[in-house]
């Protein structure tokens, strides 16, 4: 991030400079939302007075999510609140937009091409391949569907936690595959 700002500071060509100041975060889950917010905070607040050849407001932070909302695993209320916070902070939130191609200096979606040297991939991951060997029910992301004690449906002696597990809370909402959830499940 800082290197991108340094490159922009040293670039005299305004068009070339803009690609150093474009930051594209692909994936609107917890990691992508946090990353886009952090980049925006650094770009628009922390680096505000640091450069002479451009304004930090020249930076563009894009958050691209393929589904119809960011934080799709959370409630609509939380998703809407997070999107408002990000857009108020200057992040360009793009939902229902799929990334088709990433090259050295651009990101192409099904709607446009963005010149950017800075791309952060935070969109999805595959569940552990060992889950397939368990011969248990899985969700569309390949995660094992688990009971409240984190055991798999077919064998109460096999437990799956973290991003390999599809664990639903008391409101039937699947918990995200992030470290705090995995730590709590591991302690359980």
Spans of features found by a protein language model:
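Glycine-rich nucleotide phosphate-binding loop and flanking beta-alpha elements
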Residues: 32, 70, 126-127
């Amino acid at each position: 991030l800082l290197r991108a700002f340094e490159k922009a500071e040293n670039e005299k060509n305004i068009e070339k400079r803009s690609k150093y100041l474009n930051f594209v975060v692909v994936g609107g889950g917890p990691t992508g939302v946090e990353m886009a917010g952090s980049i925006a905070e650094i770009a628009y607040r922390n680096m505000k007075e640091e450069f002479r050849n451009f304004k930090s407001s020249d930076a563009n932070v894009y958050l691209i999510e393929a589904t119809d909302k960011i934080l799709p695993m959370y409630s609509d209320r939380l998703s809407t609140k997070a999107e408002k916070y990000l857009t108020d902070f200057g992040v360009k939130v793009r939902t229902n937009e799929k990334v088709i191609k990433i090259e050295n200096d651009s990101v192409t979606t099904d709607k446009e091409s963005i010149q950017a040297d800075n791309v952060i991939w935070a969109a999805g991951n595959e569940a552990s391949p060992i889950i397939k060997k368990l011969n248990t029910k899985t969700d569309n992301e390949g995660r094992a569907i688990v009971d409240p004690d984190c055991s798999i449906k077919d064998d109460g002696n096999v437990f799956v936690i973290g991003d390999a597990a599809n664990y639903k809370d008391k409101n039937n909402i699947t918990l995200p595959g992030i470290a705090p959830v995995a730590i709590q499940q591991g302690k359980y």
